[in-house]
Design a protein with these regions (language model features):
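H-loop/switch region of ABC-family ATPase nucleotide-binding domains
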Residues: 195-197
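Helix N-cap at the start of a conserved alpha-helix in ABC-type nucleotide-binding domains
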Residues: 172-173
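Conserved ABC ATPase "signature" region
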Residues: 116-132, 154
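ABC ATPase nucleotide-binding domain signature region
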Residues: 50-114
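Hydrophobic anchor residue at the start of the ABC signature
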Residues: 150
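Catalytic Walker B motif of ABC-type/P-loop ATPase nucleotide-binding domains
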Residues: 161-165
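Conserved ABC ATPase signature
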Residues: 136-140
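A short, proline-enriched helix->beta-strand linker immediately N-terminal to the Walker B motif
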Residues: 155-159
Length: 204
């Protein structure tokens, strides 16, 4: 259900175990900063909800959507963290088959139009990705690729960042780094929505 005045989105379903996403405070005076979890079992409709919000579509049967007052919502699904636009085929091929003599694009060559952005610099520091610009794309770890996906989305200055299954494939150390980065995103004024399966994954 949408309260278009207060920008409160509620997703109530027999399939979705939990879920109320608040993208603004009740006064409607702004979007609260922090991490909002939406939790449900596999197949409960979390990703569908995220896609509806990110694309600005209303599903009148379930009364889902988002307020016109929220102009920029970005969603990242981590089921395939190598899905950078335009380089996914290259990455998958070169990750498995590239030789030392093959030419492979660097991070700087792929994102050259964004490297001078204050947003890029800010979040590169938050995610500890300094000097990653010279690294070849096929040598990036899954964690580095995940962080680049987020920075790439943040360069578009979203009001809300929706992260679907953000902990897939992360070991304990990487997960700790990721949680710390999320805290810093909150401190820097970014609203984050996590789509999760396990209540224990809700960040503290």
């Amino acid at each position: 259900m949408i309260d278009r005045k207060d920008f409160i989105i509620s997703f109530d379903s027999e399939r979705l175990g939990y879920g109320k996403v608040e993208l603004s405070n009740p006064s409607g005076s702004g979007i609260p900063r922090g991490v909002t979890p939406v939790i449900g079992k596999n197949g409960s409709g979390k990703t569908t909800l995220g896609n509806i919000l990110a694309k600005g579509r209303y599903a009148y049967g379930n009364r889902l959507g988002f307020s016109d007052g929220i102009s920029r919502i970005k969603m990242i699904t981590f089921t395939d963290i190598h899905s950078f636009t335009g380089i996914d085929v290259q990455y998958c091929h070169q990750r498995m088959e590239a030789t030392a003599n093959d030419y492979v694009l660097t991070v700087g060559e792929i994102f050259n139009k964004k490297l001078d952005s204050p947003v890029w610099h800010r979040y590169s520091e938050i995610f500890r990705l300094n000097n990653i610009e010279t690294k070849k794309i096929n040598y990036l770890s899954s964690g580095e690729l995940r962080k680049l996906l987020i920075i790439n989305a943040l360069c578009e200055n979203p009001d809300v960042l929706i992260l679907d299954n953000p902990y897939i494939g992360l070991d304990a150390e990487s997960r700790g780094d990721f949680d710390e980065a999320m805290k810093q995103l909150r401190d820097n004024g970014v609203s984050v929505v996590f789509l999760l399966c396990d209540p224990q994954d809700v960040p503290a």
